[in-house]
Amino acid sequence: MRKHTLALGLMAALGFSTTALAGGAAQSIHVYKSPTCGCCGDWIDHLEENGFDVTATNSDDMGRIKAEAGLIPGLGSCHTAFVDGYVIEGHVPADDIKRLLAEAPKATGLSVPGMPA
């Protein structure tokens, strides 16, 4: 997988408050993915290996999920996740998600558009 993170996807807008990862407790994250995508499972494994408690839901209508999440065209990828009020799109590294949660900026979330190489 190519490691060029386009995590400038701190998409401005909806101000949500978050709770930082505390006391080693696993942070819950809900991932929506296409049932036919193979790389989504690898990303879910990455999240679990980095302390996240992942719930995964297969969806045949990812376009609707992305639209309801308010994703800007061009920032989409193969899966969409929700964690503590933030939208996580694509193969965002777990450390970047943890930083987002710890710093709790007024943002929609993080995005790594496109598919991994």
PLM features: what roles do these ranges have?
Residues L8-S17:
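Bacterial N-terminal signal peptides
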Residues S28-I29, G51-V54, D84-V87:
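Short active-site oxyanion
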Residues Y32-S34, T57-D60, H91, P113-M115:
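Active-site-proximal beta-strand/loop segments in catalytic clefts of secreted hydrolases
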Residues T36, W43, N58-D61, P93-I97:
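Stable alpha-helical elements in mature extracytoplasmic
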Residues E68, I72-A117:
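Thiol/selenol-based redox catalytic cores and closely related redox-interacting motifs
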